[in-house]
Amino acid sequence: MQEYNFTPESIPILHKYNAKELLKGKEEISLDLGISKEKVESTKEAFFIRGIKVEKRIVEKIAKEKQNNIFFVFPEGVKKALFFDKAVYKLRLVASDTAPTLEINGIHMHRIKGITPLEDAKSKIKAINIKPGDKVLDICTGLGYSAIHAWKASESEVITVEKDKNVLELAELNPWSRELERKEIKIYLADAEEFIKELKDESFTAIIHDPPREALARELYSRTFYSELYRVLAKEGRLLHYVGEPKKRAMNFLLATAKRLEEVGFKTEILKHIKCVLAKKV
């Protein structure tokens, strides 16, 4: 198993909200989605963002955006935080001062209705009750919010696995994912189904399983995979399994997931408010 070398890049970000601030003459704005503020120089025709010239007409166009798009300011030009590689990957703005969500083919990878991605991650950490000293396994890293908050709560090493390199490369451009570079967070670029077979028995006290919807990753909802989760979890360890809300059959899907977990030995509790199943190894 080879650890992924997570290398964050500090790229200035524009979106419709801070673009409007620039056009109104505000000199200090946030270029990292609310983490900090910095000064932007300007002339009648352009803005100078960390020394990069951005023509006023481009900022005006961004300010008129109807969608919640994010734009990176590279020396070679302003580019939307979106790329194609068999699928469409996109960072989507949730608010001007908080972490964005990840979209793959238009599907949100976080709950964003009435909640921010950070609040979503924190609610999962609270639900599984991660404490100092817990050894945490985070399955499906995504933008890393769960792994980051698991590390903060456990004050210990966190192991996280992500199958899609495109997702990790997008995370490297996301200012709210920067703490993934901490040495205590070990990232592995691997298929979770195969990766988990390499892990030792009872080596974790808490597991966060946050897979894509079942139609996209059926193997991560299988009894075979759940058996592996049971094997690597210590006795009395906790598993939090996010299952989302597959259209109108959310409760039935939660019940079916809980049943499969029970069939491999877990004791379960349905947490409908966060669309998760909480399981315990007994």
Residue ranges and their predicted role:
Residues 131-142:
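Conserved class I S-adenosyl-L-methionine
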Residues 143-155:
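Conserved SAM-binding loop of SAM-dependent methyltransferases across substrates and taxa
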Residues 161-201:
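S-adenosyl-L-methionine
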Residues 1-95:
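N-terminal auxiliary segments of SAM/dcSAM-dependent transferases
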Residues 236-243:
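Conserved beta-strand signature within the Rossmann-like core of class I S-adenosyl-L-methionine
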Residues 245-282:
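Class I S-adenosyl-L-methionine
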Residues 117, 142-143:
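Conserved SAM/SAH-binding loop
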Residues 221-235:
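A short glycine-rich, Lys/Arg-flanked "PGG" loop and its adjoining helix->strand segment in the class I
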